[in-house]
């Protein structure tokens, strides 16, 4: 078993951070077809003694505790798309809804059927793009997705409408990356108000599919104030020298590194 992305946040509402690790499954013989069997996500919840308790059983999997059948969570994000004030989880293209005490159930719309339709995303983000109090759901597809003929888009935003009826949210297509359709790997994404207009923008750490993981590129997506994301990389981050031959694996973070009031 192995994990790739962590979410650290207060899941059980006790004021202390907890830890979620999304499962990328259990590697098995390729003779089984998938090469990956389900394996449970990992959840550590803080207790009154200030210690962590292994609480993975708190996550519904519809598979007798053996792990969700989506198998491969290359992604994981925490946020509040249902607007109830606690931290939900989005991993493996399934939304895990928190009851406020650190127990997670699978959302009735963003469930295994949704995963089968859109497959496992390579990267994802929960962020309130239109300032309506509900975190929107953003995800980028793998370049080698099995359903490319039916799903040629590189990624989507599920844009909230001021309600928690996610099945009614508008689905917008994300701008493609610089290396071409089905040739771009969207490793990691982060949000922040880059242009100080009061709306969250997004940056994406990107690399090539071929040559494999060759080049490290940062895509800058600017929010228009209504939740639409426009690719303004060419104007805002020019001369990316590492985009040619730097190793493309890595994370991306948005912070004010030099304390000048502007996000880096």
Region roles according to the model:
Residues 19-23, 89-92, 137-141, 202-206:
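Hydrophobic beta-strand segments that make up the repeating blades of beta-propeller
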Residues 1-7, 59-77, 110-125, 174-190, ...:
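Repeat-based blade/solenoid architectures
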Residues 2, 17, 37-40, 72, ...:
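Residues that flank catalytic or metal-binding motifs in active/ligand-binding sites
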Residues 22-29, 56-61, 141-144, 206-208:
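Short regulatory "switch" loops immediately downstream of catalytic or recognition motifs
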Residues 10-12, 16, 48, 79-82, ...:
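Calcium-coordinating acidic loop motifs
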Residues 24, 38, 71-78, 91-94, ...:
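Solenoidal tandem-repeat scaffolds enriched in leucines and small polar residues
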């Amino acid at each position: 078993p192995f994990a790739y992305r962590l979410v650290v946040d207060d899941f059980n509402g006790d004021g202390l951070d907890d830890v979620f690790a999304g499962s990328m499954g259990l590697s098995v013989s390729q003779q089984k077809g998938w090469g990956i069997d389900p394996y449970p996500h990992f959840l550590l919840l803080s207790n009154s003694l200030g210690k962590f308790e292994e609480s993975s059983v708190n996550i519904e999997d519809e598979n007798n505790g053996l792990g969700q059948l989506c198998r491969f969570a290359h992604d994981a994000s925490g946020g509040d798309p249902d607007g109830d004030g606690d931290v939900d989880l989005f991993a493996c293209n399934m939304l895990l809804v928190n009851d406020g005490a650190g127990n997670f159930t699978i959302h009735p719309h963003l469930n295994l059927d949704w995963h089968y339709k859109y497959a496992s995303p390579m990267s994802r983000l929960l962020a309130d793009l239109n300032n309506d109090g509900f975190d929107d759901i953003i995800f980028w597809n793998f370049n080698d997705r099995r359903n490319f003929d039916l799903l040629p888009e590189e990624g989507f935003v599920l844009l909230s409408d001021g309600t928690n009826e996610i099945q009614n949210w508008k689905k917008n297509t994300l701008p493609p990356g610089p290396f071409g359709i089905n040739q771009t790997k969207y490793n990691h994404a982060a949000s922040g108000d880059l242009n100080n207009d009061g709306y969250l923008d997004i940056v994406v750490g990107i690399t090539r599919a071929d040559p494999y993981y060759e080049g490290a590129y940062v895509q800058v997506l600017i929010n228009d104030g209504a939740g639409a994301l426009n690719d303004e990389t060419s104007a805002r981050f020019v001369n990316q020298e590492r985009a040619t031959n730097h190793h493309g694996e890595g994370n991306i973070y948005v912070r004010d590194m030099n304390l000048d009031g502007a996000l880096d």
